[in-house]
């Protein structure tokens, strides 16, 4: 997506921390986690089906017109594969619906939130509590909220 400055009032943004426990945020106070874990007798593809369903539901019901997500990364190959599959779903759905999307690296999000690009999950949660009045304890939610704030700062 072309990087341009926009007024965030033009956008209804959905931020996604794509993973099996997928953090999402629409606002500093409207956020959550989708548990996409396949059940015992299901194939791994059910994670993608659940994700597609939830993503389409939120995009249509909330009139989303910009989706931002954390790009896959890390040392755990299995997690990177899952993140890549989910990111692919985001891109396909957004392309189908003609909705712009943007990926951010973990380091970009962490640096925006804390000033350092290599902090751990507890530091991201603590920064969200201190700076954004976040009341939860879930790193997936905190990451999604920070991602939303980063996108808002870029698209003002």
What are these regions (language model features)?
Residues 1-156:
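Phosphate- and other anionic-substrate recognition elements at nucleic-acid/protein interfaces
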């Amino acid at each position: 997506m072309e990087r341009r400055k926009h007024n965030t009032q033009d956008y209804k943004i959905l931020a996604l921390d794509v993973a099996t426990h997928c953090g999402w945020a629409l606002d500093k106070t409207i956020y959550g986690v989708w548990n996409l874990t396949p059940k015992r007798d299901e194939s791994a593809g059910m994670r993608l089906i659940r994700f597609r369903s939830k993503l389409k539901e939120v995009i249509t019901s909330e009139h989303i017109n910009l989706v931002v997500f954390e790009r896959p990364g890390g040392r755990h190959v299995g997690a990177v594969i899952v993140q890549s599959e989910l990111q692919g779903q985001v891109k396909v759905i957004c392309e189908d619906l003609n909705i712009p999307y943007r990926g951010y690296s973990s380091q970009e999000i962490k640096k925006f939130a804390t000033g350092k690009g290599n902090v751990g999950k507890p530091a991201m949660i603590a920064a969200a509590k201190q700076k954004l009045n976040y009341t939860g304890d879930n790193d997936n939610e905190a990451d999604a909220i920070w991602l939303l704030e980063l996108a808002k700062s870029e698209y003002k």
